[in-house]
């Protein structure tokens, strides 16, 4: 009888320990900062989920009594092996674009950086690492942009000011980092249209290009649009001819970013940058 009682007591203790352990694990899974950050990082990877941004730009200039419509094609993450083809297409259509470059690719493809600038496109910075934790949690955004800027300046002979935040400026580019951006003399551009070009890597290029073009053309409704694309994907470059044609039919012209006529395009609506 006494032996049976001891066994019951041991079982009760073991159950209690297990319950405490399970409760602690569940609490950690909910409140752990590491898990919260990981969840946050997974969210910001999806550029398409960033908020819509209204551009704080004055009324566009008019030509022959008509309001001008301007599309700013922007390409992130390059240069890469498809960039030369993209530049050929832009040249054929007499269209200018804006490129946001990764430091490692600047080093690998200096001739493409030089060509982008020589053909009238704007060359800006997209960081060295494209790493959320380093750029935002560790506060290295401005330092990485300065390093990237230096690499570009060594090739094109001038230091660009415009940056494109990897994953978009929200939520990573907090007020403290934005203050540093302003102090460093940099500007920030997010986008008004996400082409979602990165989403179609596993589709046939032609089908993917058609979908990307549709994404852009469907959403191009305002006098100025800043369009997010990436020149490291074949489907992105393949989509450009249809995008150019479709936007022209909707009355758009194509311009590169100009520092002297900067206007804010950021998810924070921070007019300083």
Curated annotation (Swiss-Prot):
Its EC number is 3.5.1.104. Coiled coil: none annotated. Its cofactor is Zn(2+); Co(2+); Ni(2+). Signal peptide: none annotated. Pfam families: Polysacc_deac_1 (PF01522). The active site is at residues 76, 230. Zn(2+) binds at residues 77, 126, 130. It catalyses: peptidoglycan-N-acetyl-D-glucosamine + H2O = peptidoglycan-D-glucosamine + acetate. It comes from the Bacteria. It is a single-pass membrane protein. One of its GO terms (biological process) is carbohydrate metabolic process. The chain crosses the membrane at residues 10-30. Residues 69-255 form the NodB homology domain. It is found in: Cell membrane. Keywords: Cell membrane, Cobalt, Hydrolase, Membrane, Metal-binding, Nickel, Transmembrane, Transmembrane helix, Zinc. GO terms for cellular component: plasma membrane. InterPro entries: Glyco_hydro/deAcase_b/a-brl, NODB_dom, PgAcgDac, Polysacc_deacetylase_ArnD. Inhibited by the hydroxamate N-hydroxy-4-(naphthalene-1-yl)benzamide (NHNB). One of its GO terms (molecular function) is metal ion binding. The keyword Cell membrane applies. It is an enzyme of class 3 (hydrolase). Belongs to the polysaccharide deacetylase family. Catalyzes the deacetylation of N-acetylglucosamine (GlcNAc) residues in peptidoglycan. NCBIfam families: PgAcgDacpgdA2_Bac. PANTHER family: GLYCOSYL TRANSFERASE-RELATED, POLYSACCHARIDE DEACETYLASE YHEN-RELATED. This is Peptidoglycan-N-acetylglucosamine deacetylase BC_1974. The lineage of its organism: Bacteria, Bacillati, Bacillota, Bacilli, Bacillales.
């Amino acid at each position: 009888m006494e032996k049976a009682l001891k066994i019951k007591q041991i079982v009760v203790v073991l159950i209690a320990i297990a319950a405490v352990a399970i409760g602690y694990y569940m609490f950690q899974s909910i409140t752990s900062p590491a898990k919260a950050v990981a969840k946050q990082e997974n969210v910001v990877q999806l550029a398409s989920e960033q908020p819509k941004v209204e551009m704080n730009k004055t009324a566009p200039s008019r030509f022959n009594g008509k309001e001008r419509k301007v599309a700013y094609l922007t390409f992130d993450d390059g240069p890469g092996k498809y960039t030369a083809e993209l530049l050929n297409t832009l040249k054929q259509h007499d269209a200018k674009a804006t490129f946001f470059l990764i430091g490692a690719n600047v080093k690998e493809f200096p001739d493409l950086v030089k060509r982008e600038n020589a053909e009238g496109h704007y060359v800006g910075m997209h960081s060295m690492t494209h790493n959320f934790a380093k750029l935002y949690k560790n506060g290295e955004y401005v330092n990485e942009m300065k390093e990237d800027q230096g690499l570009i300046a060594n090739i094109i002979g001038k230091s660009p000011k415009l940056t494109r935040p990897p994953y978009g400026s929200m939520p990573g580019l907090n007020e403290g980092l934005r203050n540093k951006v302003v102090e460093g003399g940099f500007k920030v551009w997010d986008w008004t249209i996400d082409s979602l070009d990165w989403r179609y890597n596993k589709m046939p290029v032609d089908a993917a290009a058609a979908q990307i073009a549709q994404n852009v053309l469907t959403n191009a409704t305002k006098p100025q649009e800043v369009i997010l694309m990436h020149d490291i994907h074949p489907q992105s470059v393949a989509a450009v001819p249809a995008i150019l044609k479709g936007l022209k039919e909707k009355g758009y012209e194509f311009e590169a970013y100009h520092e002297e006529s900067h206007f804010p395009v950021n998810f924070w609506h921070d007019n300083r940058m």
